[in-house]
Amino acid sequence: MKNINPTQTAAWQALQKHFDEMKDVTIADLFAKDGDRFSKFSATFDDQMLVDYSKNRITEETLAKLQDLAKECDLAGAIKSMFSGEKINRTENRAVLHVALRNRSNTPILVDGKDVMPEVNAVLEKMKTFSEAIISGEWKGYTGKAITDVVNIGIGGSDLGPYMVTEALRPYKNHLNMHFVSNVDGTHIAEVLKKVNPETTLFLVASKTFTTQETMTNAHSARDWFLKAAGDEKHVAKHFAALSTNAKAVGEFGIDTANMFEFWDWVGGRYSLWSAIGLSIVLSIGFDNFVELLSGAHAMDKHFSTTPAEKNLPVLLALIGIWYNNFFGAETEAILPYDQYMHRFAAYFQQGNMESNGKYVDRNGKVVDYQTGPIIWGEPGTNGQHAFYQLIHQGTKMVPCDFIAPAITHNPLSDHHQKLLSNFFAQTEALAFGKSREVVEQEYRDQGKDPATLDYVVPFKVFEGNRPTNSILLREITPFSLGALIALYEHKIFTQGVILNIFTFDQWGVELGKQLANRILPELKDDKEISSHDSSTNGLINRYKAWRG
C-alpha cells in the first residue's frame, strides 16, 4: 500500500475549501432544494439492505471530492492488496485475509504462494463434524449424558464477535445454552459456573497462543471446577475443546488435540468470528446457518472489491465518516440498532473500529497531524432515547449516528414493532430537521399559554436539527443479512485506515498495560509496602494491600 499523508493531497485541500462553503448549509436546505435527494443518496444491497445516507451534510460535489481523496490515496490498490494476500499488516509482517474465511466461491487466495482455501475448508469441515456431534447428542460427557451448555472462554475478538452474533441470531438458536466468559475478574466465571452442570457442559477455550492471561486464568478455574466433580483428568477431553494453534499447550491442559481447531496468523482477533473462533456460533445456530453468515459477508466482500467507489457502500460510509471527523471535528459516532437482539453490535464495533484505527502514528512512523479513528458507542433503541439522545439532539457536540433496524421482526407481538420503527423513523427526521422557534411558539399559542411563559420556555423547546444520520434498513435480521452488515462495517473501517494512512490491523496499544500488569502482579503477592512506581501507583497499591487484609 502507498504511504500518503491525506492532508497533503490536492483532494484534501479542495475538501477544505468545500467545507468552508458547506459548514453553514443545513440538511433542511439540501432537501428543500432537491425533491429527489433520497433516491440520489441511498442504495440497496442484494435486496436485503437499504442504506440511506441522504440525511447528511453532503452534496454530490462533497462525495465527488471525497472520492477524489480515495483515488489519490490509492484505495483501489489497497483493496486489491488485501484480497490478494499481500502482507499489508507490515508491523507484524502478516497478510490480512478474514475475507478468505468466508470465500464461498472458493477461488484460490494465496499467501506466500500457497492457496489458503484447502486449509480453511478443512477447518470448516472439522467444525461441522464436531458441532453436529454435540448438537445431536451423539457426543456424551463423562457420565454418558449429552451436552446441554457451552461456555466460550476468550477475550477481545475471541469473545466480542461470537457473543454479539449468537445474541443477534438468537431466533435461530437450538437447544444448547450459550455462555461467554471473558473478564479475568473471578466474578465472571463464578457466576457462569453457578448456572451449569459439569456432567453436561462443554468449554471452548479460545486463545491462539494458549497463553492469554485472562483466558487461561478462566480456563484453569473452569478445569479445577470440573475436576472437583469429575475426578479423573482423562474426562477433561470430553468437556473441553480448544480454538488455538499451540498443540503442545493444548495437550498439556488435557484437551485432545483432535478437538483443537486452528486458525492462522493472517486472521486478526477482531476479524476472527469467521474462523474457528466462531465455533460457539456454529454450536448455537448450527453449521448451515453459520455458512449463511459467511455467505452474507462474502456477498459484501464481492460488492466491496468489485463495485465502483461512487456506488460502494463501505466506501461511501467511510468517506462520510472522514468528512465529519476531520472537517466538522466530530469526535464520536453512535451506532444505534433498533433491534434488541443486536444489543451487542455497538460494543463489537467499538473494538472493531477503535482497536483498528485508534492510532496516532502513520504508516511511515510519523505522528499524524489530522484525526484518525473516532470514538464508537451506542445502545439499542428505544433505550438510548431515554438515556443520551438529549445530548445528540440539543447538546453542543456533533454526533453522527447510524440507525439500524429490520423491517420484519422475529417477534411480531401486537404493534410493538410498528412502535419501534415509528421511533426509528422519527428520530432521524427530528435530528435532521429539528423544530423551529416559530413552530414552538405556535404550539404554545394554540395551548393558550400567556406571552410571559411563552417567551421564557420557547428557547428550551427549540431543536436546531442539522444532526447527521445514516439509516440502514434490513429486510430481516438473518444469518445472511447479519454477515453482510458486519462485513459492511469491517470494510468501512479498512477504507478509513487506508485513507488516513495508518495500519488498521495491528494493536500495539494493548501491550503496555499488559507488560506493566505482569510487572505489578508479583508485587501484590505479599504485604510489603511498594515504592518502586510513581507516587499515585504506589499509593493505590499500598491502599489495596491495607484494605484487603
From Swiss-Prot:
Which biological processes are named by the entry's GO terms? gluconeogenesis; glucose 6-phosphate metabolic process; glycolytic process
The cross-references to Pfam families, in alphabetical order and at most eight, read: PGI
Keywords assigned: Acetylation, Cytoplasm, Gluconeogenesis, Glycolysis, Isomerase
Q: Where in the sequence is N6-acetyllysine found?
A: K80, K228, K234
Stored InterPro entries: G6P_Isomerase, G6P_Isomerase_C, Phosphoglucose_isomerase_CS, SIS_dom_sf, SIS_PGI_1, SIS_PGI_2
Catalytic reactions of this protein = alpha-D-glucose 6-phosphate = beta-D-fructose 6-phosphate
Q: Which residues form the active site?
A: E355, H386, K514
The protein's annotated pathway: Carbohydrate biosynthesis; gluconeogenesis; Carbohydrate degradation; glycolysis; D-glyceraldehyde 3-phosphate and glycerone phosphate from D-glucose: step 2/4
| SUPFAM superfamilies associated with the record | SIS domain
Q: Which residues form a coiled coil?
A: none
Molecular function via GO: carbohydrate derivative binding; glucose-6-phosphate isomerase activity; monosaccharide binding
The EC number on file is: 5.3.1.9
Localization, per the record, is:
Cytoplasm
What Gene3D superfamilies does the entry give?
1.10.1390.10, Glucose-6-phosphate isomerase like protein, domain 1
Q: What Gene Ontology terms describe where this protein resides (cellular component)?
A: cytosol
- Its chief place of residence is cytoplasm
Concerning HAMAP family, the annotation shows: G6P_isomerase
Into which family does the record put it?
Belongs to the GPI family.
Q: What does this protein do?
A: Catalyzes the reversible isomerization of glucose-6-phosphate to fructose-6-phosphate.
Q: What is this protein called?
A: Glucose-6-phosphate isomerase
Species, as recorded: Escherichia coli O1:K1 / APEC
Underlying gene = pgi
